[in-house]
Amino acid sequence: MSGWRRIYYTLLDLPLKLLVRSKVIPADPRAEAGLDPRQPMMYMLPYNSKADLLTLRMQCLKQGLPDPLTPLDIDGVTLPRYVFIHDGPRVLTWYAEKSQSVSLFHNYLDLHRSNPALDVQLVPVSVMFGRSPGRESQTSQPAPQLRLLNGIEKFFAVLWLGRDSFVRFSRPLSLRYMATEHGTDKSIAQKLARVARIHFARQRLVAAGPRLPVRQDLFNKLLASKAIEKAVEDEARSKKISVEKAQQNAIELMEEIAADFSYEAIRLSDRVLSWTWNRLYQGLHVRNAERVRQLAEEGHEIVYVPCHRSHMDYLLLSYVLYHQGLVPPHIAAGINLNFWPAGPIFRRLGAFFIRRTFKGNKLYSTIFREYLGELFTRGYSVEYFVEGGRSRTGRLLEPKTGTLTMTIQAMLRGGNRPITLVPIYVGYEHVMEVATYAKELRGAAKEKEGLWQMMRGLRKLRNLGQGYVNFGDPLPLATWLSQQVPQWRDSIDPIEAQRPSWLAPAVDEIAATLMVRINNAAAANAINLCSSVLLASRQRSLTRPHLLAQLACYFELLRNVPYAPDITVPDLTPEALLAHALAMNKFTVEHDTIGDIICLSRDQAVLMTYYRNNIQHLLILPSLVASIICGHPGIERAQLQQRITLLYPLLKAELFMRYSKQELSPVIDSLIAELARQGLVDAQETRLYPAQTRLHVLQLLAASVRETLQRYAITFSLLRANPQLNRGTLEKESRIMAQRLSVLHGINAPEFFDKAVFSTLVATLRAEEYISDTGDAIDEKVSEMCDILSELITPDVLGTIESASLLAHGPASAALPAD
């Protein structure tokens, strides 16, 4: 670099270092974007901007990547390490050389023709100062966030938006591959430049999103739609009001529903949330975000479908997506959050509000469906919670399918962009509403959201530990429907909302698939692992060595026989994990002369069931295997497989587990092999025995499934006692008996007698043909399950269930058989 050029860049670099604090996307470009600094590397930027180039240089030096200002010397030929795709205005037009991207590409390709060993990585990089998409009324102005700026505009962009800047590294393109597969002549270089322009245009759309509508223009367009016109006429006729009054009602509903997205609100909230997260959370862990970026760049309409743990979810997900270089979505939020001042703030951050029920209000349901369809048509990403509300137990709830149905109906309008559903697992080490959830499960009335409740909640925000956002396996709707409902395209109608016969069963299956994929991306952490161990112990307490041994067992199970490829397990030793958990002040440590005892008080144990339930599905099968082996020393493998095969459909329905019946057998074999490797099980030919040297670890693992089996025993006991029980009565009596059992045996889990759990169980009994179409129990199948369950439950609990069955339905012979 010449002396004058060095002075020029140095002078330009000084103010940039003061004004610019750019974020790198992805966070680790070497690992996540596949950049290898050992190979020759060339950077490709969209616009001729020295500010962009020097911002890129700052990040390259931080990330250990080659300096873009250092030329490449190849076979005695010196070439620039960067290229601008577009020429344009510069601060010093008399000084800066004209960009000649096609000529430079051709020179590089020519070097590859003469040197077969050469392979230069061409790395596309976008540098963004601000990401405002602009408003649709600004038709004469191109989107400002990545457009070509003159020197004065760029100066003010850096001055105002330097702290809201992003450097986005894309995966490199191998120029060796281009030269080998496509040749090295100038037409290939021209094609490469054209493809680069398309790539950067897509990235601009991914980063900023489509233009935002003027709200009144959006309302006018919705009012003009045929569906809403008809709904307005029906409203006027049914309520005996004028059409003008019905239209006014429609506009009021639109005002209630529609978001008022503001980029400035997003920027301000990012500052506030960055400050907040850094003080409340010890870390935010994001996995598989590259999947979503790839989908967005390929032009997919993305619908984010997270699990719902807390009111924090809304803010956390938008924050994470923004920092992953993606547009924060329009979020379906419950109408209960539309209170001052939260409602107006959420609305500007992209929230649109939805009532709990649409029943009896055709105008509302039509407007909501048309608004959702309009969001898809305009290309905005959308987020909704398919569970319909926050989980009070820590488990996934049965999905509510209304919004999902509307999503598929929007696709049946015949839009051009493919719609893809992205399941998201959200996990916390501390959920501020957990104590409230426990009260509600015990029968307390749900507190209404409002300013006072929000202020009380803010006071509780402290030491939230780690947060986890894991993006699951995406579900492309068109692909899924083509496989499951080949004739689905016959139902496409650009005008009317369609309800073909296949829609309801398809929606139910898609919803269940999404729940399974959310669980497939679960995050184990210090709190849910330690809670799982301590809650399995009889007195909710363990010595430190026993607790560490159990954590080591769980770590090895989750790492060596992972539940699913997308689950995450802490990269810590058991000792480090326990130290972190104790620092969260959720566990009590008692000291004596022998050593430490880690405990949970009775009240705290109730709250910790929430965190245990977050990952219960990860450990339930290993626990069931351990339980059967402990209860049947010397059991044949085939018998163990047979028992688990019978019990598994109940677990699968309750916990949204991923394995089909065909996949179950090899999974069980893998778990047995892992337990044997850990020295917990002694496998002798076809028989399985508990290993006496580590019996305590195996028994504690087995205890994790204890409460689940007790619940099943209650329901099957009632069925056996009275095969004619109808489903509603069976659910009710099961809950009553579960409450009795929890009092008599100190069961602290609020979900033990949760209505939804028994409702799912009874529905599964019908699906698995334990109950006939007429509602009667199938004696042989029920008796077989009763026999299996009676062998896995302790005599004291079994006695309580038997006595309760006697009181409810008479003969003792109808209850579970005693040991």
Curated annotation (Swiss-Prot):
Family to which this protein belongs: Belongs to the GPAT/DAPAT family.
Domain notes: The HXXXXD motif is essential for acyltransferase activity and may constitute the binding site for the phosphate moiety of the glycerol-3-phosphate.
HAMAP family on file: Glyc3P_acyltrans
Protein name: Glycerol-3-phosphate acyltransferase
Locus of motif HXXXXD motif: 307-312
Cross-referenced InterPro entries: GPAT/DHAPAT (IPR022284), GPAT/DHAPAT_C (IPR045520), GPAT/DHAPAT_LPLAT (IPR041728), GPAT_PlsB (IPR028354), Plipid/glycerol_acylTrfase (IPR002123)
PANTHER family in alphabetical order: DIHYDROXYACETONE PHOSPHATE ACYLTRANSFERASE, GLYCEROL-3-PHOSPHATE ACYLTRANSFERASE
Keywords assigned: Acyltransferase, Cell inner membrane, Cell membrane, Lipid biosynthesis, Lipid metabolism, Membrane, Phospholipid biosynthesis, Phospholipid metabolism, Transferase
Keyword Cell membrane: yes
A Pfam family per the record: GPAT_C
GO annotation, biological process: CDP-diacylglycerol biosynthetic process; fatty acid metabolic process
EC class (word): transferase
Lipid bilayer topology: Peripheral membrane protein
Enzyme Commission (EC) number: 2.3.1.15
